[in-house]
Curated annotation (Swiss-Prot):
A divalent metal cation 5 binds at C33, C35, C36, C49. This is Metallothionein-1. A divalent metal cation 3 binds at C14, C18, C23, C28. Class I metallothioneins contain 2 metal-binding domains: four divalent ions are chelated within cluster A of the alpha domain and are coordinated via cysteinyl thiolate bridges to 11 cysteine ligands. Cluster B, the corresponding region within the beta domain, can ligate three divalent ions to 9 cysteines. Gene3D superfamilies: Metallothionein Isoform II. A divalent metal cation 6 binds at C36, C40, C43, C59. A divalent metal cation 7 binds at C49, C54, C58, C59. A divalent metal cation 4 binds at C32, C33, C43, C47. A divalent metal cation 1 binds at C4, C6, C20, C23. It comes from Danio rerio (Zebrafish). PROSITE patterns: METALLOTHIONEIN_VRT. Residues 1-28 are annotated as: Beta. Keywords: Metal-binding, Metal-thiolate cluster. The gene is mt. Residues 29-60 are annotated as: Alpha.
Length: 60
């Protein structure tokens, strides 16, 4: 069972607290998430989520 309902609801959970919205993925992939550490306005395209944040190298 796919825990990601992206195709149906456009939202999924990657990791414990990272929730991505406007998700177009058909399966739950961490790279689909756009969760960022506090202070980051956004993550670079294709950023891989690590828990509920991404590395500083992902931030733009």
């Amino acid at each position: 069972m796919d825990p990601c309902e992206c195709a149906k609801t456009g939202a999924c959970n990657c990791g414990a607290t990272c929730k991505c919205t406007n998700c177009q993925c058909t399966t739950c992939k961490k790279s689909c998430c756009s969760c960022c550490p506090s202070g980051c306005s956004k993550c670079a395209s294709g950023c891989v989520c690590k828990g509920n944040s991404c590395g500083t190298s992902c931030c733009q």
